């Protein structure tokens, strides 16, 4: 019983969190094959815009 309740809790949290922060900026970033990060971009990436309704950064690989 405990395991089934735990799994139900995990599944409900997972499905309720999907697409909560997705806005037009996140969609545009992902369509351009870039990566969204909440904090600074990783070392080999640079910031090209925002994600998560302005709370994150859209990062593109340096070539």
Curated annotation (Swiss-Prot):
Q: Where in the cell is it found?
A: Secreted
InterPro entries, per database record: Defensin_beta-like
- Alphabetically list the UniProt keywords: Antibiotic, Antimicrobial, Defensin, Disulfide bond, Secreted, Signal
Q: Please provide, in alphabetical order, the Gene Ontology terms of the cellular component aspect for this entry.
A: extracellular region
Q: Where is the signal peptide?
A: 1-21
Instruction: Give the function comment from the record.
Output: Synthetic Defb38 kills both Gram-negative (E.coli and P.aeruginosa) and Gram-positive (E.faecium) bacteria.
What biological-process terms (Gene Ontology) are attached?
defense response to bacterium
Query: Which SUPFAM superfamilies does the UniProt record give?
Result: Defensin-like
Question: What is stated as this protein's family in its record?
Answer: Belongs to the beta-defensin family.
**Tissue expression:** Only expressed in epididymis (caput, corpus and cauda).
User: Where is it predominantly found?
Assistant: secreted
| Name of the protein described by the UniProt record | Beta-defensin 38
- Disulphide bridges: 29-58, 36-51, 41-59
């Amino acid at each position: 019983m405990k395991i089934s309740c735990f799994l139900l809790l995990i599944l409900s949290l997972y499905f309720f969190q999907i697409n909560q922060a997705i806005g037009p900026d996140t969609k545009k970033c992902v369509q351009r094959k870039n990566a969204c990060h909440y904090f600074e971009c990783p070392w080999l990436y640079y910031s090209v815009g925002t994600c998560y309704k302005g709370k994150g950064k859209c990062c593109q690989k340096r070539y």
